[in-house]
């Protein structure tokens, strides 16, 4: 797994050992970041929340392309070890790549200031969409989500209906949906 573009282009990232995580493939990341760059007009200065960071590939790609700060949340020990190793390998300071060892669903970063511009949600597929998007709704209600923020939600293809209903119920609108095999990547906005 490698960083596709920007300052860290070509740098290899380590993924956690085992089957608890499934890193987003290079192909999917490349398509996603092209769509995000078009929707956002680039990444310069973005404040990123990576709620289920795993290896951190999504945040590191955003940082490589000009994001200012990434808050990476992870609770799995093996994933945390890989994540922290990737931060060190890229030479990122703790002010740029802020790693948080905690369950973001139980303890969301509602006091974050400045608010998040870009949110990555790549939870285990078994997680309920209402719980995952409910956490983002809590951020919005607390002022920790920018009004024009983009929320990227990667999920299993069969769960599209539950994501749609949870998004609508919680005040988010689908901006785009792309399917890559068994994986779907949605880009959501506040409605």
Segments and roles (model prediction):
Residues 1-191:
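Class I S-adenosyl-L-methionine-dependent methyltransferase catalytic core
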């Amino acid at each position: 797994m490698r960083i596709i573009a920007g300052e860290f282009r070509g740098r290899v990232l380590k993924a956690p050992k085992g089957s608890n995580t499934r890193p987003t493939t290079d192909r999917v990341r490349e398509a996603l970041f092209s769509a995000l760059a078009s929707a956002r007009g680039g990444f310069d200065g973005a404040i990123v929340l990576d709620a289920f960071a795993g290896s951190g590939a999504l945040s590191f790609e955003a940082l490589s392309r000009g994001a200012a700060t990434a808050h990476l949340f992870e609770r799995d020990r093996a994933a945390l070890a890989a994540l922290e190793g990737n931060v060190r390998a890229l030479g990122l300071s703790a002010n740029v790549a802020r790693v948080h060892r905690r369950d973001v669903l139980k303890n969301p970063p509602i006091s974050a200031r400045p608010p998040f511009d870009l949110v990555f949600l790549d939870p285990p597929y078994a997680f309920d969409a209402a719980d995952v998007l409910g956490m983002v709704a809590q951020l919005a209600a607390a002022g920790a989500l920018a009004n024009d923020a983009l929320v990227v939600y990667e999920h299993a293809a069969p769960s599209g209906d539950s994501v749609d209903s949870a998004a609508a119920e919680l005040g988010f609108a689908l901006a785009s949906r792309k399917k890559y095999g068994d994986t779907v990547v949605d880009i959501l906005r506040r409605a």
